[in-house]
C-alpha cells in the first residue's frame, strides 16, 4: 500500500473530523479485508498451524469511544478512505477509555480499560508535531505599534500535545487516511526545586495535569473538578488539531485567507465546538488578523453535526469555569455573543425571548450548540425525522434565522466491518448471489430481492443464521455460564444504557412474559433468548439500577426449571465492537424501542438490518427511513408517534397512573419492582425505578419516556413476532428483504452526501506504480 496518510504532500482539500470518541474496534482483520489480503493471510497462517481468528482475539479494542457517536466516527473514517478522500480524524488517546465493565453481583462495576498495557501496534507516535496547550492565567492587553490592541495569555499552566497516527485503510484503493489521537505530556516532568522546598504536590503538578487530561473518556462531571476536566479535554484536542491543520496548510500555501478553500473542520456533536473560538484566537492573536478577517475565515471553515434532540444533552458550561480555564477563548466567545445578540435585537426588536433562546452566553452559561450554529456554515441532523424536529422544535429560532445552514445527512454504517468482517458466512452468501461489488457499493444488495422467495436461498440464509447463533451461544456459555438454545428467537437490545432507549421497558416485558408463563404453563409460546448489552455512565444511577434489574431478573428466570427454558435472559458484560459483530450476525430480532422523538438516528438498527435481523421499533430516528425502505410487512412498528409524544409533553396531559390502575398485567409487573420478587425481598432496591414510572422525580414528570404508555402496544408487537417466527419461510423472506433494502444505510452514501453538500472534497490521486 502507499503510505499516503492523507495524501502526504498533496495540495488537496483536507477534512478534519473532530470527535470526542472514535470507537474503532480491532484493526487487524478489518485492515486485512480492506487490503484484499484476509484470505491469503489466513491460508498462510494455517499452513504453519496458526489460526488467524485466534490472533485477532489477542488485539484489544482501542478504548477511544463508548457508544454510537464514536462508532459513527469510525465508520465515517473507513468510508472516507475507501471513497478516496483526504481526512484526519481528531481525538484523544485515552489511556483507559471510558471504563471496562464488570458485572459483580448483578451490579455494573467500572474498572480501568488498560488497552495500552502491552503497547498497540497500529499507531505511530509523531513527536515532530508537538504543540503547547495553555490553561488558566489571565489576559494582558497592550497597545501595539500599529495602534491595535494585542492580547497575551500569561500566568498559565500548559501541557504539550503529541499526536499518534492510526492508519485508516481504504478498501482496495491504496489510500490510507489517519486517525490523529493526541497524548498529553508535561512541559517539565518534575520540579526538583519545588520538591526540595517540600512542596511535593507542586513538584509533580505539571505531570499530573498532563496525565489527567488523557486518562479517561467522559470523566464523571457530577462535580466541579469533573466539569473542569471535561472542558480541558475538549480544548486540548481541539487546539492541538487546529494548530496541526494550520501548520500543514502553511507548508503548502502562503495566504491564510485561502484556508476555507482547503480545510474543513467538522465538529461531531457539541464536544469540539470550542474550535470556533480557538480558530478565531489563533487568527487574531498569532496571525495578526482583524476581527472581520478572522470571522470570515472561521465561518467558512467550521461545520457542525447535531446528534441530539434532547435539550439537556446540548452542552453548556458555567461561565465562571469557562472564563477561568480559557480566559482568552472566553473573551472571544463573549465578543461573538455580543455581536450576535445585537443582530437578534435588530432583527427582532423587543423580543427578549429570542435572545434567551439564541444567545451564546445567557443565565450564567456558555451554550456550545448555539456557538456552533452561529459560526458554522453548515448545521446537519443525522436522520430525516431528527432534522425535522430540530428545524420545527428544538432549533426553530435558528432555522428561521439561518435556513440555508440546515440540512440532513442520515447516518450510515460500513458494510466492510459489519458484514464482510463481522459475518463472513453471510458475506460469502451475498457475494454468491449478487457479486462482490456490494463491498464498495451497498446498493447492489438490492439484487437479493429476487431470492427472498426462493426456498433454497431461504434455507441457506436460515442455516447461516443458525451457525452464527451457535457461535454466540458458545460465547455466552463460556462467559456467562448460561445455556441458550440456538433454535430460540434471539431478541437483542445492545446499545448505550439510557432511559430514553427504554431498556427498562424491555426487561419489564420479560417480567410480564414470565408472569404469563407461570400463570399459564401450557400457553403457546415460542422460546425466546433476550440478550442485553450496555454500559451505563458511571454517575448515572437510574441506568445502573436498570442493569442490576436485568441481571436479577435473569437470575430468577434462568434458574426456574418450571418454565422449561422457554425464556432465557443474558446480559453481555463489557459490550464492545468485537463482540458486537458476533451479536449482529446472530440476532433474529433487533430492539430499537426508543421513545419516539428522542433518538437522533441510531446506527445499531442498520447493523442488525444488514445482518438479516428484523426490527422491532418505534417510528423514531432512522427507523422511519428503514420502514420506508423495507416496507410495513418486514418490520414490526409499535407505539406513539413523535408528534404524539411531543404533544403530550407540551400539554402535560399524560398520567401513567391511568394506565397502571387500568391494566392489571402492567400493575403487577410494576409492583414487582418493589415487592421483593426480584430482589430477595429487598423492597427498596428498585424503588428508584418504580418511582421513575409513577411518581414525579426531582422536577421531572413521572414516566417521562412513556414506558407504560407504549407497553401494551410493545407486548402486542412481541406477540406477533412469536407467531411470525414459526413460519420459517415467511421469516426468512422478511430477513432477506431487510438485507436487500439496507443499501441506503451505508456510511459510503452518507459520506458522499457530506462531500457533495458540505465539504466539497477532491479525491486523492494515487500513483500505484510499484505498489
Spans of features found by a protein language model:
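Single conserved hydrophobic/aromatic residue that forms the stacking wall/gate
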Residues: 2-7, 12
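Glycine- and acidic
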Residues: 53-64, 217-232, 256-268, 276-285, ...
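An amphipathic, hydrophobic-aromatic interaction surface with interspersed Lys/Arg
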Residues: 61, 84, 98, 239-319
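Catalytic or ion-translocation cores adjacent to nucleophile or general acid/base/metal-coordination motifs
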Residues: 91-92, 99-104, 108-123, 290-335, ...
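Active-site cores of enzymes that catalyze phosphoryl transfer or operate on phosphate-rich substrates
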Residues: 123-268, 317, 321-382, 394-496, ...
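Extended, hydrophobic alpha-helical segments in both membrane/secreted and soluble proteins
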Residues: 242, 269-280, 293, 297-298, ...
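Long, K/E/R/D-enriched contiguous segments that form extended
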Residues: 302, 309, 466-580, 768-769
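Catalytic binding pocket for nucleotide-activated donors in carbohydrate/polymer assembly enzymes
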Residues: 397-447, 585-586, 593-735, 739-744, ...
